[in-house]
Amino acid sequence: MDARFERYVENLRTVRTLSQPKFSPDMKAKELLETIQSNAIKCFDYMKENNAILNELVFQRAPAELTSAEIASLQEFADKMFNYASSEDCGIAYKVYSLLLENARIRGDKPAIVRYLYGKAVSLHYLNVRGRDYAINPYGTQVRGLFQEGAGYIAEYESFDKTTKGYIMRCLGNSRMSMPRSTPEECTEYMKVFDKAMGIITDPYYRQLDPDLPWGKFEYAMHMDRETLLSYLRRYNDPVVAAKVMESAEAIYRDRVLYKGEEARLQNWRVSYLYKAACFHAGRCTAREVVEELLDIIHHTDIQDYSDTGINKNLTAVSYLVAYEVKMPPADRREMACRTEEVMDRSLRYLNNVPQNQYSRVVSRAVRELVEMQAEAGTARRSLLNYILVAHKPTYVHSMMVAGLTRMFVKQMLKKSPELFVGVMGCKTVEEVRRSRIEICELAYECGLYHDVGKSYVFMYIGNNYRRLLDEEFTCIQWHTVFGYELLCNVGGKDDLAPAALYHHTFYDGHGGYPKNYPPCPADIKPIVDALTVADSLDAATDNIGRCYTMAKPVDTLLGEFHAQRGTRYAPEVVALLDDEDFCRDLKETLDETRKSVYLEVYHVKR
């Protein structure tokens, strides 16, 4: 592999270490801030070096001009970057596989085409961001198209070597990957693709032809994927799908002991739960038995186990428990109420005790699932959102800063133009606005605090400080507004917090920003969203402590940009506040002193 690729990997790992510093509680405040700032500057320098490496060796390369040695080096680099859920850099693996695929097409090298179709498809799948049941799935169609093209080479199967045959079968098995599965119609299409692929994978002809291929692993992985239909079955009584899910659950449960050690990617803690849940939907057991199984999993897990498996058993298992508790008869629910409440309290104690310097993003995902399941059960708790924010410290710092700045802008707007807030929080007159100004300011703070909660779905991109974002990654990041909206709707924020999350990147005049194709921001929250939009840009652009993907801008420079985009991107009423010298002075002091305080609070160091 080219030594420059080795340098890229070294830089990547160094930046990841610098981006996730661990501080002792007794560290001096000045030392902590200086360390974060120094790390950010170092990360920026590493990023520039990595961008130069990628431009030279990947982004600016013509596929037709690659030599055999360069192809081998690129393939080794891509394989090093991609390792499914444990990938070093999934996005760059995708770009390299794309380059290699174009080269293979030019050369007419069919084995290489199949190999790189699989590589490009599977890396794009892991790069892609997906909502619940794949309802949000920006690159799903592309992923399926690539896998289906690779699977199409089954027509020439006998002519290929064993390695290529393995990739054809992987493409075939994954051809159902990224398919939506939230409605009966979508499940029907999913099952058609699944059954076709499984029919070939279990066909004795192919197994006898190549007995050394890992047929059991292919089959096991497909059965695991079909278990995702349990989410569908919790909403629909579908005996046909339930029978298929039961079939997969039995296969997984039967083969669970076969995949350990290096094969653990195919095995996880959920197997016994999946079996019980499938039994319930197939009419073979009660909801109480599913809940009992989950309680057993939770109670046999160390409450101080903060490994990924420990987090899933202590938290994700609770979300599944919530989902099946509501399906129990009232008498069973009353009888088990103490035990289920005890588990909920236990999960909150667990969250409170997670070492903050080791806070895993797995925690964030587990809490999201818990919120979603509680929403289905009608018991969602808004307080859980704070645990999502804590999972990524830079986002937590930014959210706290934006919360304070939004409240500051709204407070000033209430003084100068209270009429703008008629309609907010049900206020029908200016006098009602004045009487509700404290509550409006607190709502503004909450909107700012949770505006980026949807980024918990895309932490893998916003934590990328070792190279520039790819266009595909930026597209995924843009969905954080919609994810945030859905998450906040689940906790009762549909009329205030959720719209703030959805619209904070939409231009004031409606002709720019994202997301696209949504109705205008509701008038009864728009004044707060307008203030939030300015506050968001202000903090992101001026953070001179931890920001490392670009250099911070001077406040005066940014004020000029606000004025230049007044009436288009930013609300005139908010930008007008920046003409007040006293307010601007207070704003600059807030940006400086408050930012330091927030960093110290988030990293748990006292001033």
Label the predicted regions.
Residues F280-G283, H299-N314, V322-N352, L385:
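Extended, non-transmembrane interaction/recognition domains
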Residues E56-T67, L100-V114, F147-K165, M198-K217, ...:
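Flexible helix-coil transition and linker loops at the boundaries of alpha-helical arrays
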Residues F160-T163, D210-W215, V422-G448, L488-V534, ...:
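Histidine/acidic-rich helix-loop-helix segments that form or flank divalent-metal centers
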Residues P329-Q478:
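Acidic/His-rich, divalent-metal-binding segments that scaffold phosphate/diphosphate chemistry
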Residues A29-E56, F82-E102, R132-I154, S182-R207, ...:
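Helix-turn-helix repeat elements of alpha-solenoid scaffolds
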Residues E6-I41, A62-N83, K110-G131, S159-S182, ...:
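Amphipathic alpha-helical repeat scaffolds of TPR domains
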Residues M400-V410, C476-C489, P554-A571:
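An active-site-proximal "capping" alpha-helix that borders the catalytic cofactor pocket
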Residues Y8-N39, E335, R339-R346, Y350-V354, ...:
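Intrinsically disordered, glycine/charged-rich C-terminal tails and inter-domain linkers
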